[in-house]
Amino acid sequence: MTEMTSNEMRGYATSQSLPATILLVEDEPAVRHVTREALEMGGYRVLAADGPDAATHIARDESNAIDLLLTDVVMPGMNGPELARPVRELRPELVTLFMTGYADAEVLRLAMLEGPHKHIQKPFTVHSLLARVADALAARWNDRDRKQAPQYPSP
């Protein structure tokens, strides 16, 4: 990831999105640590899990607080699209951002079948991570606002 100052990160996230809680699922400790730091410096609340089992427990406990699922695609035991299914059952409007180091079209195709999602290719920069997170959250909030807007009859 490229360098951004703390003020740049905080400024970017607050100018691009509302405060949000992100469930981060990454089995590689170094990647999880750096990604968590970048997101927190960007102004987000981060719930971090080292794999699908821990993520499922966090999702059950915090389902009403989670705004975005940010998960690795390839993990031992269960892949990202498989993890997204039970998390989305708890929070159907959840948008998922998949992180992948592979250009595996089949995994991403399966992810598309699971519901609304976006993906980001590893390695990514802090700027591109924050931009993708902000875009995913904006899309979710815009969709939610559209569904909650009053419906007026046609003349």
Predicted stretch roles:
Residues 50-51, 76-83:
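Acidic catalytic/metal-coordinating carboxylates
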Residues 33-41:
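Charged docking surfaces used in two-component/phosphorelay signaling
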Residues 80, 111-120:
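As written
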Residues 72, 100:
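Active-site residues of response regulator receiver
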